[in-house]
Amino acid sequence: MEKKASEGLTTRLLHADRRGGVEHGATHKPLHPSSAFGYDTARELVSVFKGERSGHVYARQGNPTNAALETKLTLLEDGVGTVSFATGMAAIASLLVALLKRDDHIVASRFLFGNTASLLNTLEGLGCGLTLVDATDAADVERAITPRTRLVFVETIANPGTQVADLEAIGKLCGERGLLYVVDNTMTTPYLFRPKTVGAGLVVNSLTKSIGGHGNALGGAVTDTGVFDWSRFANIAEPYKKGEPRGWGLLQIRKRGLRDIGATLAADAAHRIATGAETLALRMDRACDNALRLATWLAAQPGVKRVNHPGLETHPQHANAKRWFKAGGALMSFELDDARDCLAFLDRLDVVIKSSHLGDNRTLAIPVAHTIFWEMGAQRRQAMGIADSLIRVSVGIEDHEDLRADFERALAAV
């Protein structure tokens, strides 16, 4: 069955499985837990190994269930292909290990998720150059580029400070310099924003977060948008220069990243994530509305020093966020005034769960300086804009009145 050109994203996601071919009239692709795949003849097996025909040989580098999810993710990002991984961090690590060599240079935002920042520090210790920049200013990115620079890495909306990268200008800069532009789209999701529109060559998503949405599966993905010319990338090995250049990068990521590192997405997790993705638009609309309403209310409270959310007109990058994104996202953060204890405040919350996760249907909160960023040290946290009293809130889809009442009670108690 052919899709209609006028169909919306949710319609296409809901009907992707049956249009891709399913047995017995099923509306979902089946779960394939097999770890290996057999063929009738040795020649067939050899041809799949050599990439001469499509198929699966060993589930570490792919299986039909993961492939069905990858098809949906490619649709979401309007890309040319996707490789799925066990987690979002596995996706980032595998991408970087697969594409970089010793002495290559990375330009990255200094406003990054703590584990991503830690990974980049590890790569620096292994011989890659690293320059951290203010990604809200493309001029700062440009100053950091050297002849050894291979890629630029940013997040759309930074976690947890909500800084919005200068996405369009950085994309133009990378295009002019022939650099690979990698954008982590986790905070916005492909429903709110497609990095392809600003020139991103590769897009990373943590599927554990809003795309899966239900907090019941770990996963990550790298999608090739088709924008980057891989024939210009010096690090593509000869075995992966097969067919048109647009497929080279993702093939090397699947082989040197997924196959060799082995951070494979479990088939049952892929199945749950694919189901969750079908309601992405509905969930994001609700969560983003809740987040903006809660942020607006918090910003007016006397016990709150600062609120960070791109949807607020007071946000430094509000104009860009409004121009690029359908909404400001479901993540916000805020600081209490100096007289209030952020840990005591969190203890007073009842509906909101104290958890390090985000992108869940449930609203979650965490004191970031004391938990996920404590390893960074005070000086590094200060450079990243993370105050000791900063609380990150991943806003879910609960009834807004219940969330506001929960925060109101907690503020009154401290």
For each feature predicted by the language model, list its residue ranges.
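N-terminal glycine-rich, Lys/His-bearing helix-loop that initiates the first secondary-structure elements
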Residues: M1-R53
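Conserved PLP-enzyme active-site core in the AAT-like
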Residues: E2-A5, L13-H15, R19-V22, T82-P302, ...
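Glycine-rich beta-alpha junction loops
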Residues: R18-G20, P33-Y39, K209, G226-F228, ...
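Conserved N-terminal alpha-helix of the aminotransferase class I/II PLP-enzyme fold
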Residues: A36, T41-A93, N115-T122
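Glycine-centered tight turns that cap/initiate beta-strands
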Residues: D78, R148, G303-R306, V351, ...
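PLP-dependent enzyme catalytic core of the Aspartate aminotransferase-like
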Residues: L120-T122, P147-R150, R283, R340, ...
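Conserved small-domain helix->loop->beta segment predominantly found in fold-type I
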Residues: I261-A263, D285-R286, A291-R362, M376-Q382
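Short, well-ordered beta-strand elements within core beta-sheets of diverse protein domains
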Residues: R272-L282, G329-D337, R392-G396
